[in-house]
C-alpha cells in the first residue's frame, strides 16, 4: 500500500540529526554534544501550576487559539521582551510547540510554485513542510557572510515567485543573530512587497552580549513571529508555542491550526500561564551558564586551530572541519568511533553545512571538558597523520 501514499510524503527523509543520533545510540561510553534542548529542569513554580491544574481537573478542550488569559499574558510578556505588540484576541495563537506553529503558518501562506528564501546552513525542520505545500525552498549560502542572511543576499534571491523569507535567528545550528541595523535593512527591502517574513525566534531569550531584536518591530504587517517556551523555560516536552500575526492573516492560520490539533494541551497552557506571568526572568540562570560554557568552548576550539564564528545566541557552535579533507559525516563518524565523541554532521543542515560540525553546549561543564579533551586529541592525531602522508612517509 505504500505506493498509494502522497509522493511528497514518501520523499521526505528522516532528518540528518535523527539519523546520526540513531548511530550514536549504538555506541557505548560516548560524550554526546548533540543535544538540542536545555539541560535544566522546568522551573518548580511552573510544574506546581501544572499539578494544580490537574488536581482541579482542567482537562477539557480550550479555545482553538488557547485560553484568552494566556494570550493576554503572552501579549504583555512579549511586549516587554521583544518590543512588539499583537492583539491577544485576534493576533496570537497558542500552538503545540513552535514546530506546529511553523507548519500551520506555511500551510496557510504557501501555494504550489511559491518560493521560500532561507539561510543555509539551517535547521532541517522547514524544508519538508515547504515541500509538502508544493512550494520550493530557496536556500541561500551564508557561509561567506558570517552565517547571516543579509538584505543583499535576500535581494539577489528574490523572484516574482518569492512568497516568504525565513529568518531563524538566533540560529540553529550556527548560533549567530542579526543586529538591529541588519533587521532594519531587511525590513526596508521587503516593505510593501507581496512577501511574508516568518521570523522563528524560539531562541530569542538565549542571547549573549547583545539584546534580541525582532523584525516584527519594523515590518509588523508582513511578519509572522514564531516563539514559545521550550528554550526560555526548559519546557521542550510541554509543547507550547506562540504564533503572532496580523489579524487578517492570523484568522486563516487559526483555521489550519484548528483542523490540525484543535488546541494546545490545557495542562500545558496553565503551566505556560505561570511561566509568562511569574517567570519573566527564568531564562537568566540558564543564559548565564550558557555564556560561561560558550566562552569556554569557543576558546578551546580556537586553541585547537579550528576556524569558528563565535555565536551570539542559542547553545550551538559550528566549527569548520574543512582543513581535514573529510566530509562532515565521515569526520563525525571517525570522531565517534575513535574518540567516543558525538557531534552533528554539518550536512544535516543543508548542503551549505558541509564542512562543518554542530556542537551543543547544553550540557555540564564536566561533560564539555571531557568531550573537548577527546576532540583535541582526535584533532592532533588527524593532523599528525595528514603530516605523515604529506611528507611521504
UniProtKB/Swiss-Prot annotation:
Its EC number is 2.6.1.-. InterPro entries: Aminotransferase_I/II_large (IPR004839), AspAT/PAT-like (IPR050596), NHTrfase_class1_PyrdxlP-BS (IPR004838), PyrdxlP-dep_Trfase (IPR015424), PyrdxlP-dep_Trfase_major (IPR015421), PyrdxlP-dep_Trfase_small (IPR015422). GO terms for biological process: amino acid metabolic process; diaminopimelate biosynthetic process; lysine biosynthetic process via diaminopimelate. Gene3D superfamilies: Aspartate Aminotransferase, domain 1, Type I PLP-dependent aspartate aminotransferase-like (Major domain). Pathway: Amino-acid biosynthesis; L-lysine biosynthesis via DAP pathway; LL-2,6-diaminopimelate from (S)-tetrahydrodipicolinate (acetylase route): step 2/3. It is found in: Cytoplasm. It is an enzyme of class 2 (transferase). Coiled coil: none annotated. Keywords: Amino-acid biosynthesis, Aminotransferase, Cytoplasm, Diaminopimelate biosynthesis, Lysine biosynthesis, Pyridoxal phosphate, Transferase. It holds the Pfam family Aminotran_1_2. SUPFAM superfamilies: PLP-dependent transferases (SSF53383). CDD domains: AAT_like. PROSITE patterns: AA_TRANSFER_CLASS_1 (PS00105). It comes from the Bacteria. NCBIfam families: PRK07683.1 (NF005817). Essential for murein biosynthesis. Probably catalyzes the conversion of L-2-acetamido-6-oxopimelate to N-acetyl-LL-2,6-diaminopimelate. Homodimer. This is Probable N-acetyl-LL-diaminopimelate aminotransferase. It comes from Bacillus subtilis (strain 168).
Amino acid at each position: 500500500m505504500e505506493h498509494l501514499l502522497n509522493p511528497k510524503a514518501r520523499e521526505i527523509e528522516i532528518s540528518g540529526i535523527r539519523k546520526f543520533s540513531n548511530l550514536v545510540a549504538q555506541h557505548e561510553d560516548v560524550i554526546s554534544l548533540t543535544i538540542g534542548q536545555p539541560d535544566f529542569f522546568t522551573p518548580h513554580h511552573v510544574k506546581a501550576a501544572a499539578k494544580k491544574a490537574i488536581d482541579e481537573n482542567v482537562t477539557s478542550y480550550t479555545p482553538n487559539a488557547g485560553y484568552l488569559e494566556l494570550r493576554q499574558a503572552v501579549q504583555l510578556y512579549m511586549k516587554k521582551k521583544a518590543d512588539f505588540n499583537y492583539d491577544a484576541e485576534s493576533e496570537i495563537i497558542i500552538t503545540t510547540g513552535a514546530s506546529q506553529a511553523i507548519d500551520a503558518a506555511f500551510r496557510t501562506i504557501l501555494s504550489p510554485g511559491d518560493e521560500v528564501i532561507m539561510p543555509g546552513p539551517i535547521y532541517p525542520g522547514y524544508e519538508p513542510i515547504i515541500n509538502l505545500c508544493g512550494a520550493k525552498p530557496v536556500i541561500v549560502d551564508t557561509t561567506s557572510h558570517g552565517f547571516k542572511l543579509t538584505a543583499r543576499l535576500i535581494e539577489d534571491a528574490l523572484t516574482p515567485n518569492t512568497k516568504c523569507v525565513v529568518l531563524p535567528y538566533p540560529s540553529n545550528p550556527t548560533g549567530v543573530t542579526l543586529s538591529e541595523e541588519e533587521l532594519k535593512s531587511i525590513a526596508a527591502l521587503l516593505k510593501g512587497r507581496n512577501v511574508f517574513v516568518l521570523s522563528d525566534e524560539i531562541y530569542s531569550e538565549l542571547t549573549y552580549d547583545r539584546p534580541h531584536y525582532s523584525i516584527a518591530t519594523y515590518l509588523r504587517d508582513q511578519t509572522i513571529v514564531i516563539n514559545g517556551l521550550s528554550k526560555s523555560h526548559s519546557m521542550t516536552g510541554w509543547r507550547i508555542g506562540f504564533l503572532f500575526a496580523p489579524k487578517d492573516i492570523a484568522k486563516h492560520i487559526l483555521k489550519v491550526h484548528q483542523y490540525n490539533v484543535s488546541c494546545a494541551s490545557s495542562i500545558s497552557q496553565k503551566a505556560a500561564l505561570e511561566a509568562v506571568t511569574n517567570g519573566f526572568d527564568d531564562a537568566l540562570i540558564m543564559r548565564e551558564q550558557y555564556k560561561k560554557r560558550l566562552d569556554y568552548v569557543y576558546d578551546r576550539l580556537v586553541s585547537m586551530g579550528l576556524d569558528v564564528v563565535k555565536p551570539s545566541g542559542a547553545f550551538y557552535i559550528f566549527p569548520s572541519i574543512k582543513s581535514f579533507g573529510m566530509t562532515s559525516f565521515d569526520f563525525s563518524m571517525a570522531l565517534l568511533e575513535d574518540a567516543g565523541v558525538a557531534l552533528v554532521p554539518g550536512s544535516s543542515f543543508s548542503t551549505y553545512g558541509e564542512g562543518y560540525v554542530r556542537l551543543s553546549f547544553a550540557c555540564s561543564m564536566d561533560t564539555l571538558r571531557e568531550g573537548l579533551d577527546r576532540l583535541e586529541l582526535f584533532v592532533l592525531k588527524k593532523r599528525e597523520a595528514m603530516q605523515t602522508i604529506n611528507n611521504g612517509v
